[in-house]
Amino acid sequence: MSDWRLTENVLDQNIPETKPRESKTRLEEIQRLALFQEELDIIEELDDPVDVWYRCIEWLLETRFLGMETVNKMLDDAIQYLERCRFALNDVRHLLIQLAKIKQSYETPDELQQAAKQFYQLASKGIGLELALFYEEYGSLLIRMQRWKEASEVFHAAVSREARPLVRLLRNAAEFSRAYDLHNAHPSIHDAPYSSPFPPPRIVLGSKPVSSSTLPSKPKSFQVFSDASSSRDSQNASDLPQAKSLESEANTPNLPLLYDKSSGKRVEYSAFNFLALYENGEERSMEECRAQRYLSSIQPNTAASFPKVVPKNEISVHHDSSSSNVSPIYKNPVAEQSDTPTRSLPKNYAYVAKSTSPELKVFDTVMPVALSPKPAQKPPSPTIHTKAALADILDIFNQPLRSESLEKSSKSPISAQSSYLGTPLKNDENSSNSGATSLTGRSQEEHLDFIPSLTPSKNYPSKIYSPNKNLDFSHTASKAETYKNSNELENVKREQPFSELLPSTLQEETATGTTSTTFANAKRRPEDSNISPTNPKKLHTLPRSPQYSTVDSNSVLSPAMPKGYMFVNENQSMKHESSVSNPVATIPHENGKHDFGQLSPIEHKPFFPKNDDELPGPSGYLTMPYEEAMASLSNLPTLINPLDQSLRDLLFQVLRPSLLRDKDYHEHETSFALVEHIESFVSKIKPKAGGPGRRRSSNRHSLDGPEFHLFYPPNTNLSVISKLGQGAFAPVYLVKSKIETENGDVSQGGAENNESKLFALKIETPPSCFEFYLTRQAMTRLKGLRETNSILPVHQLHMFHDTSHLLMDYRPQGSILDLVNSMHNSTFSSSGMDEILVVFFSIEFLRIIEALHTHKIIHGDLKADNALLRLETVADSEWSPIYSPEGLYGWSFKGIYLIDFGRGIDLSLFEEKVKFIADWDTDLQDCIEMREGRPWTYQIDYHGLAAIIYTMLFGQYIETRIEVINGQRRQVLTQRMKRYWNQDLWHRLFDLLLNPTLHVSEENLPMTEELSKIRIEMEEWLVNHSTGGSGLKGLLKSIEKRKI
């Protein structure tokens, strides 16, 4: 009889054979075993301990120099541990470890019998009973032992239990069934001894055994008891039982039986809340519960605290726990006049207000009104005219109008605040004179204080920065009065208001204009949706990284303008009055659908004056003495929120004197009212085929098209061409301009000649000066260093009451994120850039971050879309293919631009002991200190840099996990490095950036020396590998030609 085995040897597929690797040494295997032992020491803290044992056993079976004693010991330890874990009973990795132990007994017949016993023990322990692998290997072993009946029972049990995977199990069971039918006629199958392959089921008390194996094959007959054949006379009388008197037992009184006499009526059932009987762990009688409920009906202040039972189809009656705060008009006059207890209402009754006077419509008297309960029905179908659908339609038509509901709510004695909070407020004279109360219960005086809404961590002090309430920011003194004591300014640049230049009708309309939304504490909000991938088939395109939004960009509304004032002659040129520096804009005529080839320019004055009392934050120029601001800044606590608006207002007062000395900083005593007009203009411009997005190069096609002209005093003419992108805080527009000073010279950072040059204009709402300040500070502190080439210059800042306008250089090559997405779209690959490119850009990032941190500047918002490509044109003869770390031979013209310093921090303004804490929603793009609510300083930039390098390497946003290594919590990457990468260098770099405080103490940050060492290693590697393959020069040249 031929031997039969499974066609699919699942065990051999899952358990690797012992194939020693020649490249290993005994020392390497011992070191690897020690690493596994470290993981096993902390296995109780891991989420998946089975994985550690499985990887360890799998590796041990491949070792060459470690003896079988070590392998067997680890197998026994693994089995002993996993058998105690209930979650590992049906884990396939646990079963594979058990099979690896059993496989050692697959040689001789005696060992096969021992292996069958081990399978029997696994079944008794419930290991692998839900896995098809267990039954397949068990049945294969029994067939090798010629135990076909037991094998058939094993496969039947597997199919009945629907072991997984079921499809493979059914296929193997069908194959076994065909082989069993062929051997069924052989007499040796029927003569072979039978023993159950599974242990008998446990018998529960009161249940009959089901398994036939527990019953004896031949039950014995009952034995009849008989006395021994001996003489009755020889028996001792004392051995016989004594006779008892039946008469004494009959006279014994029986025990009374307790039962309820039947009344002859139908059995009644009552419902009761038995939880009320055992309230607070004490048992109470039903009479006590009834009495307490009776007392609660006549004494509301002494109402019982146990839950109330609401019978079916009955509307519950709500009782207030206290009536001390209720106005007398809400009291029940019926209950006050009568001392008799209120009678309980029958079912289907509820309290309904009955009006006794025309002014009081609710809560006057309480009268019971019968309600007919509506049966619960399913939602009606919108296509079938059922009664329920008609009832819903009638309810819609019968509901009160919005104006009527508002009028009724105003007449109601319950105020809007009380209805919102759920309980009526006390309506007395004191409350009416104390000012309007907001929904949070704060008066108007309290809202004048700048109090941050930070919720500190429980492990850190709760004293977060909150300025002194005695500081007065409400006055709007002139600049001369503000700084007359400190002698800070001699000549203050301040444009004259143009309210007198506007028509009277326009002044009346702008007087009622809406103010911009105040800048609340920063909360994270995703960016605009127009940055999504343009091609739906290219699924690997990364979206823009999340931004931190604080206000709605649509909150600034422009007042209406008189039509008679806006239209002028088409050929009329812009004229400026000599007495005033008047900002003027020229926009296309928006009269329905018109052709952009025939535009009618409209000249008007877009900036409207506002009342300073209505202006939020620094945009209103709320000033305070310079000495007082510096004193408040020096008295800050050690833990502050860097984005708290009150702190930023204080910093603005400190920085304002130095900003006013800058000739490129301009403050306007007006509001900008053209944001909506600009948006309307750019929305009508049709982009090129390929879709919208933040593609800077795709906007060059509209240079010869229509323009939206703007004029900023004193002498800046801008022409809006198109929209570059939409951030969470501000839109960015492509503009062209010719910037000249009063003497006719080009302003700082401007064009080298009088021809038009392209710029980027960022209009931020609410206004902020910190991006302009930090960018200028970085350029000043790094002056003369090579790192200044990596900072995008800013040229002018115009501060209005509602917006700030930052003019900066325009770079059409795109950002690092655009480059990653472009490579995804061109190669349809999920990976990132070439490693040599990642090393080059990482060196540029490390160099600029080291320089900024050395000069106490934190960028605060490092991400892939805040770094622009800087690939300037260099002659091929002047550009060496070998990389130069010193920037020689044309390499100084290649690198990156850092942008968006708006969330940056100038540490020189704070004490050295000051640390920061995040008060916004965080994710994996933030450092672990921010996610865990711990203080941080430079860690935010280190994590941001790690996220950028991760995106360049893998083409994804960074994902990390926490591992305990050598007793220390470390952040590690979830992705594995490719085998041909320089893994050692990348692992050390990511470990340094993700775990900086494990390498340097928090007091010794920043760790510029450690980063400098790794940067030098990367530069040496890049010098040796810059000419391999396509070469670094060839890759950069292809990026320059690529349309990002």
UniProtKB/Swiss-Prot annotation:
Gene3D superfamilies the record matches: 1.25.40.430, Transferase(Phosphotransferase) domain 1
Domain BUB1 N-terminal: 36-204
UniProt-listed SMART domains: Mad3_BUB1_I, S_TKc
Principal location listed in the UniProt entry: nucleus
Compositionally skewed regions (Low complexity) per UniProt: 504-518
Ligand binding (ATP): 728-730, 762, 809, 865-866, 900
Composition skew (Polar residues), residue ranges: 223-239, 430-442, 544-555
Annotated GO MF terms: ATP binding; histone H2AS121 kinase activity; identical protein binding; protein kinase activity; protein serine kinase activity; protein serine/threonine kinase activity
PROSITE patterns reported for this sequence: BUB1_N (PS51489), PROTEIN_KINASE_DOM (PS50011)
Location(s) in or outside the cell: Nucleus; Chromosome, Centromere, Kinetochore; Chromosome, Centromere
Positions annotated as active site in the UniProt record: 861 (proton acceptor)
UniProt entry keywords in alphabetical sequence: ATP-binding, Cell cycle, Cell division, Centromere, Chromosome, Chromosome partition, Kinase, Kinetochore, Mitosis, Nucleotide-binding, Nucleus, Phosphoprotein, Serine/threonine-protein kinase, Transferase
Pfam family, one: Mad3_BUB1_I
EC identifiers of the protein: 2.7.11.1
Region (Disordered): 209-259, 317-343, 404-446, 484-555, 685-705
SUPFAM superfamilies xref list: Protein kinase-like (PK-like)
GO BP terms in the entry: cell division; homologous chromosome segregation; meiosis I spindle assembly checkpoint signaling; meiotic centromeric cohesion protection in anaphase I; meiotic sister chromatid cohesion, centromeric; mitotic sister chromatid biorientation; mitotic spindle assembly checkpoint signaling
Name of this chain's protein: Spindle assembly checkpoint serine/threonine-protein kinase bub1
Naturally occurring in which organism (per UniProt): Schizosaccharomyces pombe (strain 972 / ATCC 24843)
Origin organism lineage: Eukaryota, Fungi, Dikarya, Ascomycota, Taphrinomycotina
Annotated gene: bub1
